[in-house]
A protein has these predicted regions:
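Bacterial N-terminal signal peptides that target proteins for export
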Residues: 2-9
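Sec/Tat signal peptide C-region and signal peptidase I cleavage site
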Residues: 19-23
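Acidic, low-complexity Ser/Thr/Gly/Pro-rich repeat segments typical of extracellular/periplasmic
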Residues: 24-197
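Bacterial N-terminal signal peptides
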Residues: 10-17
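Sequence-level preference for short, compositionally simple segments enriched
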Residues: 195-502
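Small side chains
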Residues: 13, 59-61, 260
């Protein structure tokens, strides 16, 4: 009997041991590898676990300078990443009384406290993760760790690592469920490259595998100086095929070309929207020129001019008011770029030329003050394609030889409802020789009285078989152009130089 009892207890112990072992999650791969050298200063830290990873809500990830023992960066996992509910309306919120100043200063997490107001807004007292990106001192909410299956990516605060330093990483128990953590100076070490790229070459390579000058696009853009004087002094950034899950924001850049290896192969994306990174509660944003910058886009080029973006896919991974791309500036050119967002998938303020681009959105898919010239672009939308907000100072949106595909019965070409007591009487939309697919016969949605002076023109719209679209049911404010009577006007709108003034 005693022998049988011992055997039963032994078997039970073995079973419990198996359960305990199965509950443990261990590291099967580190990147950078332990002891790695020649690491880029903008590197993410990734861990591949033995089992699917679940992120915890306690403990910290810490990075130390190995030589001095100085704490370089710390991610406190007890702090929530960002808001999950929209902020309440602020009845006294207003546009900034003076234009927002885009100062060219070296503002980073190393020399400035994230959350420092950059304008007339008040301090944000919310207790969320904050990271200064692209010199925006107010900071962005961010996810310190993102998990996809067995892989964990750790996002250090930007610009904390330096060239020619050796670092070690510690991870507390609780940061990852079922993982005992990582302790000591030898568990995970790496050394960064000795020197920065040669600025005189003006050619930078970004590669997600760490084999380029930078591992992230943000790292490359941070390296490029502000307001380059001429095209001859401009920079070219080549982005290798890869998955770049990063929030990209840069400002004050000029004469920069960002070119991907291929549109399908380069994906730059992040889970961002107006809820996660809202505008300051006391400030209105996005509506008028010179107001406080938006932080809700996955990719934002702010106060930038003479940019070229080519062969990239830009995507937000969130629903709601969520741009895949937000651009503010003049004379910006986009070719073969795929933009994926939800509401306001593309926000374009300032003159932009779009060549052979694809834009996919959920509604008000194209937003902004314009002017924008779309040439051979494809746009899909579940809701209204655009909400144009240009003033009399410039043209609005012009589409030439484009394809608009509706994905629901609500996919009207545009709308102009009153917006919090105001409207856009000078709004302009022109469609020339466009393919319209599954667009409601009425064409346009709501146009309130205060916007009935808007310019809405259409010429030679046809279906996917090349047959003319029946425009008899169009909104009466949508004017159909005649090839003979309106030949001069059609010619003008077909000319990007006339529309964009460059």
């Amino acid at each position: 009997m005693k022998t049988m009892m011992k055997e039963m207890l032994l078997a039970l112990g073995m079973m419990l041991n198996v359960v305990v072992c199965q509950a443990q999650n261990t590291v099967s791969r580190l990147s950078p590898e332990n002891g790695a050298t020649e690491v880029n200063i903008d590197t993410h830290l990734t861990m591949t676990m033995s089992d699917d990873a679940v992120i915890g809500q306690r403990g910290s990830v810490s990075v130390y300078d190995k030589k001095t023992g100085r704490l370089v960066d710390r991610l406190d996992m007890s702090i929530p990443a960002g808001p999950t509910k929209g902020q309440p309306n602020h009845p006294t919120a207003q546009y900034t009384p003076v234009p927002y100043r885009y100062r060219s200063q070296n503002i980073t997490n190393r020399n400035t406290k994230a959350g420092t107001p950059s304008g007339v807004n008040v301090w944000d007292t919310g207790r969320y993760q904050l990271d200064i990106i692209g010199g925006f001192s107010d900071g962005f909410h961010f996810y310190p760790i993102i998990a996809h299956g067995r892989q964990l990516t750790i996002y250090l605060h930007h610009n904390m690592l330096e060239y020619g330093h050796e670092y070690y990483v510690t991870i507390d128990k609780g940061v990852v469920e079922g993982f005992d953590g990582m302790k000591g100076k030898k568990a995970w070490t790496f050394r960064t490259k000795e020197t920065a790229p040669d600025r005189s070459q003006r050619l930078l390579t970004v590669s997600a595998d760490g084999k380029g000058d930078f591992s992230t696009l943000q790292g490359a853009m941070d390296f490029i100086p502000d307001s380059v004087a001429s095209a001859q002094d401009g920079y070219r950034v080549l982005v290798k095929n890869g998955d770049y899950e990063e929030l990209v924001y840069f400002r004050n850049k000029r004469f920069v070309t960002i070119e991907g290896e291929s549109r399908e192969g380069v994906l730059i994306h992040y889970p961002n929207n107006e809820v996660f990174n809202p505008h300051p509660a006391d400030i209105k944003t996005n509506e008028v020129k010179g107001t406080f910058p938006s932080r809700r886009a996955a990719f934002a080029a702010d106060n930038c001019s003479d940019l070229t973006l080519r062969n990239l896919t830009l995507r937000t991974d969130c629903k709601g008011q969520a741009e895949g791309l937000l651009v503010n500036g003049e004379r910006n050119y986009f070719e073969n770029v795929h933009i994926i967002g939800d509401g306001d998938a593309l926000q374009a303020n300032g003159s932009c030329y779009w060549m052979n681009c694809r834009i996919d959105g959920g509604g008000d898919t194209i937003l902004g003050r314009g002017p924008s010239f779309f040439n051979h672009c494809t746009i899909t939308s579940y809701g209204t394609f655009m909400w144009i907000r240009n003033t009399e100072e410039n043209h609005g949106n012009v589409f030439v030889d484009c394809h608009l595909k509706g994905l629901s019965e609500y996919a009207e070409i545009g709308r102009l409802p009153d917006n919090k007591g105001k409207n856009y009487p000078h709004a302009e939309c022109v469609l020339l020789n466009c393919t319209l697919e599954d667009i409601p016969a009425r064409g346009w949605g709501t146009i309130d009285d205060s916007a009935k002076t808007a310019t809405i023109l259409e010429f030679n719209s046809h279906d996917t078989d090349g047959k003319p679209v029946d425009t008899s049911g169009r909104n009466p404010l949508m004017r159909q152009l005649n090839p003979i009577r309106d030949a001069e006007l059609i010619g003008r709108y077909s000319d990007s130089h006339w529309v964009l003034r460059w």
